[in-house]
Amino acid sequence: MLKNDLIVVVTSVGTEEQALDVAHALVRSRRAACVNIIPNIHSVYRWKGRVCDDGEMLLIIKTLASQFEAVRETIHKVNTYELPEVLGYRVDMASPGFLSWIEKMTALPKRKVAGKAKTKTKAKKAPGKKAAPRRKG
């Protein structure tokens, strides 16, 4: 997988507040271009020896493969689950315009350099003085 490959990351959270926290953290930090929040999903799973049946919210995160680890880390920091689900899927086909938009939205802005760029200039000789002779050899 190339670092500029489009991926979709899927995760689930227990509350709308957590969903918004994850979504805003990812988009603000430019780790994701877009996060869809799908409310009212129902998950049935086995955890610590028992079958659980919970309401959750599903997040669909659009980003680049190069951002996967940062997305995973953000989800683990914000999500309150002991073992958050973080699944990444490569997207095999997408419209070129959408892919270009994802690349722009996840690119970190270029830093502006304070002040002017320094350029080399020839040293000027003091008025009325001759330049020192060059040594040969």
What would you call each of these model-derived segments?
Residues 1-125, 129-137:
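Positively charged, small/polar-rich N-terminal and surface patches that mediate targeting and assembly
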